[in-house]
């Protein structure tokens, strides 16, 4: 069995007048993430990790931010398409380990919902998705609440 590991990272700016989508769910917050799509940094980091593990470039290559068809798209659609892309190359997801960096909103209570939603999109068990949340102790752009970032590591294996 061929096992591969991928790493993904994404960051988006927090702005007024946008909804805050994280981990495939809508969160109540006075600001949202700015981006061509819904700007869900966690989903984008997972997509990049999956594509990287399969040596299939990155999310911007497959879903360019200058393509009208992806304007304001639900990132869960991009995730589903990413899973289909790696499956077409003969890979399935083993597990995902991800971290969201945000000062606010507090995310602990939302993590089980994120796991469930993302598991359904990817067709895997929620137990195979670890999501953690942390702050940067008020340091940097995250600490100043100017943006939110996410990191993801994935394991995929050849079917």
Swiss-Prot record:
Which residues does this entry assign to the site Transition state stabilizer? 36, 135
In the record's cofactor note, how is the cofactor described as bound?
Binds 1 divalent metal cation per subunit.
Reactions mediated catalytically: 4-CDP-2-C-methyl-D-erythritol 2-phosphate = 2-C-methyl-D-erythritol 2,4-cyclic diphosphate + CMP
Q: Is-annotated flag, keyword Metal-binding?
A: yes
Which controlled-vocabulary keywords does the entry list?
Isoprene biosynthesis, Lyase, Metal-binding
Sites where the protein binds 4-CDP-2-C-methyl-D-erythritol 2-phosphate: 10-12, 36-37, 58-60, 134-137, 141, 144
Cofactor(s) needed by this chain: a divalent metal cation
Domain of life of the native organism: Bacteria
EC no. given is 4.6.1.12
Instruction: State the pathway, as annotated in the record.
Output: Isoprenoid biosynthesis; isopentenyl diphosphate biosynthesis via DXP pathway; isopentenyl diphosphate from 1-deoxy-D-xylulose 5-phosphate: step 4/6
| InterPro entries from the UniProt entry | MECDP_synthase (IPR003526), MECDP_synthase_CS (IPR020555), MECDP_synthase_sf (IPR036571)
Q: Name one GO molecular function term.
A: metal ion binding
Q: Name one GO biological process term.
A: isopentenyl diphosphate biosynthetic process, methylerythritol 4-phosphate pathway
Quote the record's binding site residues for a divalent metal cation: 10, 12, 44
Q: What does this chain do?
A: Involved in the biosynthesis of isopentenyl diphosphate (IPP) and dimethylallyl diphosphate (DMAPP), two major building blocks of isoprenoid compounds. Catalyzes the conversion of 4-diphosphocytidyl-2-C-methyl-D-erythritol 2-phosphate (CDP-ME2P) to 2-C-methyl-D-erythritol 2,4-cyclodiphosphate (ME-CPP) with a corresponding release of cytidine 5-monophosphate (CMP).
Q: How does it assemble?
A: Homotrimer.
Q: Which family does it belong to?
A: Belongs to the IspF family.
Q: Which NCBIfam families would you find in this protein's record?
A: ispF
Put simply, this protein is called: 2-C-methyl-D-erythritol 2,4-cyclodiphosphate synthase
Encoding gene, per UniProt annotation = ispF
